[in-house]
């Protein structure tokens, strides 16, 4: 239903957002899973890692909004809508469930999110000028899927507690895991970014 040019624009915008999403998580998906799996105090470990995710996600969101305001090519509705995916990274705690080997909840969540997205797209999108609505459905259900995971997470978590020294010990390993992910991301999405810039 959408033209190749419209889908190309979406691919370009999405490639830009993916860089910020990568920074927002900063290797925490892998590192957090390992730490939760090995921890005897899951709640304390979770909060001391999650605060890093909050900070990096906050930085990513602020810089992203600054860029879409500054760069003419990033103006418009779709880049704004895609920002929702960065808020999704802010509340993404899938690594907690991965660390606890509770993959059932993640699988069910992913299935419901995809089904809701597909049903919404087929129900509400009926014209070529609704690309923004297509993108909205993709990101909003993913965001809601991340948000709802906080409900079952309560059984693992107590009141937030933070230890500056422990937080510092988590920073270097997350950065070290982040760097290879940057290389992979550049390999996967850089072509879309360059096509958008040069096009």
What are these regions (language model features)?
Residues 34-40, 76, 86-110:
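Membrane-interface junctions at transmembrane-helix termini in multi-pass inner-membrane proteins
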Residues 13, 18-69:
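Membrane-water interface segments that mark the loop-to-transmembrane alpha-helix transition
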Residues 1-7, 123-127, 185-199:
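Helix-terminus/linker motif at the lipid-water interface of multi-pass membrane proteins
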Residues 19-23, 66-97, 143-144:
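Alpha-helical transmembrane segments of multi-pass membrane proteins
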Residues 3-7, 66, 70-78, 100-105, ...:
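Membrane-interface helix-loop junctions in multi-pass transport and translocation proteins
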